[in-house]
Structures are given as C-alpha cells and as structure tokens.
C-alpha cells in the first residue's frame, strides 16, 4: 500500500459510525511521549545499575579496610616483637640511649661521692691534728704545773722540817725530863710484890705544821733571848717588871691527855666541847673540840668549819691557850 493510500481516508461504509478524523500533530505528540517514556525507563535502568555498582564498591572497600587494618596490626605486632628481641639482645637503640644516659648519671654521682669523701677525710684529718696538738699542749702544761706544785710542796715541807728541827734543837734541853734517882732495895720475904709505877711519860716534842714563818721566827728569837745570859737589870727597867701570863714566854702550862680527855690548866676538856682558842698574837677564835688524840687535839672553827691540830707541847709552852665558853 502506498503512502497516499495509507494517508487517504477509507470510504465510509453504509450504516457504520463515522471514522474519527486523523491529525498529524497528535501522532507527533504521541511519539514524543513515547520517546520520553523510553528515555525515562533508560535513565531508571542506568540508576539501578549505578546503585548496584556502588553497593559492590562499598563492599569491596570494606573488605579492603579490614584487610588493611589486619595488615597494620600484623606489621605493628611484628615490629614490637622485633624490638623485644633487640631489647633482650641489648641492641635496641632506645635502650642503648637510655643506658648511656643512666651510665653518665651513675659516673657523675660516683665522682661527687668520691669528692665528698675526700673533702670529709681532709676535714677529719685537720680536726684530728688540731685536737692532737691541743691534747699534747694540755698534757705538757699539766705536767709542768704538776712538777712545779710538787716542787713547791716539797720545798715547803723541807723548810718546815728544817724550822722544826731548829726549834727542837733549841728547846730540846728544856723539854728533857730528868729521871728520878731511886734506890732499889732488896725485897724482904714477907713484903708484897711492888706495883710498877704507871706514870705517863711526858709528851715528846711534836712537829708543828700550823705556824707561819713569822710565828716560827718570833719563837726562835724568844728562845734565843732565853738562852742568852741575862744581865742584871735595874728595878726601873722594863725587864724587871712582872710580865703577864700571856706575855711571859717562860710560863708553862700543865697539859696532858687521859682516857680521851684533855686536862689543861686544872680543867678537863672533852670532845664536842665549845672553847675559845687564843694564840700568841692575841687572836681569839671560837672553836669546838673535834677529836682528842694521843698527843694532840683537833679543833674546828665555828666561823668557817676548818680544822686545826694543836699539840700538847704547844699548850704546855703557851703558844695556844684554851678557855671555856658557853655552848650556846
């Protein structure tokens, strides 16, 4: 069929409804709509393909990420194992660096400790030398002082002994007691056995350690005057005048010790008795008899509680005079 025949309208049949009219514009619109529909279906198909591709790509990326993470873990684990092996072998760089730093600190502390030890040792040695010198100096000073004190003490004792010896030589003749001449008769058969005479021997001259040098020299001068020949004196001279008992050097007192008591100047004195002690220089001391010995007594001053030793010879010669006093 030709195009004209296709385009020409068919003859209308009798009794049939009229055929619709054909317009070319409508065909074009229909074709355009079909094209648009086909284009839309094509786009939808492309979008579905793209979505499927994106899903596959996401799955592939996730697998790659997991694989990469596992690989990183394995690499890090291998690195740590390698570092641990190097640390055990001592070849790890970080370990060597820190060990070097610790070694430097150790050497520095050792050096400081040695310097401190040296400094302290020098200080101790200096103190030792100083203390040793001070001890030696103190020892020498004490030795010299002790020697001087002993020499002075011995010289003093020597001087006192010489003075006492001189005093005994000068007063020896006056202190000697002449023995009583007695005749021993033959005892008759009926006579009783004679009882021996229990007379107490006179006290010998005692060394005096309580007098000063001035008192000793004064006693020596007095004794020398007594031993020198006396010249006749006129009644008006001072020597002819009667001397008082305290001033007369030739006056002697009766003094003895019996049964732990002192008999002096017709009075008895015992231990712990309060007395006055008068010396030749008119010094009067308040004392208490501390003890009574065989040939001497000890008295204690009430002022300073110092003790003095008084011999019987001194009391007999009048160098010291004892007076009673009230105990209150």
Curated annotation (Swiss-Prot):
Residues 66-171 form a coiled coil. Residues 23-37, 45-54 have a biased composition (Acidic residues). There is a cross-link at residues 69, 178, 201 (Glycyl lysine isopeptide (Lys-Gly) (interchain with G-Cter in SUMO2)). The modification Phosphothreonine is found at residues 49, 244. It comes from the Eukaryota. It is found in: Nucleus. Residues 1-16 have a biased composition (Low complexity). Its main location: nucleus. The keyword Phosphoprotein applies. Polyubiquitinated. 'Lys-63'-polyubiquitinated SUDS3 positively regulates histone deacetylation. Regulated through deubiquitination by USP17L2/USP17 that cleaves 'Lys-63'-linked ubiquitin chains. The keyword Coiled coil applies. Residues 188-226 are annotated as: Sin3 interaction domain (SID). InterPro entries: Sds3 (IPR013907). Keywords: Acetylation, Apoptosis, Chromatin regulator, Coiled coil, Isopeptide bond, Nucleus, Phosphoprotein, Repressor, Transcription, Transcription regulation, Ubl conjugation. One of its GO terms (cellular component) is Sin3-type complex. Residues 2-170 are annotated as: Mediates interaction with USP17L2. Residues 1-65, 226-252 are annotated as: Disordered. Residues 56-65 have a biased composition (Basic and acidic residues). Expressed in various cancer cell ines. Homodimer. Component of the SIN3 histone deacetylase (HDAC) corepressor complex. Interacts with SIN3A. Interaction with SIN3B enhances the interaction between SIN3B and HDAC1 to form a complex. Interacts with HCFC1. Component of a mSin3A corepressor complex that contains SIN3A, SAP130, SUDS3/SAP45, ARID4B/SAP180, HDAC1 and HDAC2. Interacts with USP17L2; the interaction is direct. Interacts with FOXK2. The C-terminus is involved in transcriptional repression by HDAC-independent mechanisms. Belongs to the SDS3 family. Regulatory protein which represses transcription and augments histone deacetylase activity of HDAC1. May have a potential role in tumor suppressor pathways through regulation of apoptosis. May function in the assembly and/or enzymatic activity of the mSin3A corepressor complex or in mediating interactions between the complex and other regulatory complexes. PANTHER family: BREAST CANCER METASTASIS-SUPPRESSOR 1. This is Sin3 histone deacetylase corepressor complex component SDS3. It comes from Homo sapiens (Human).
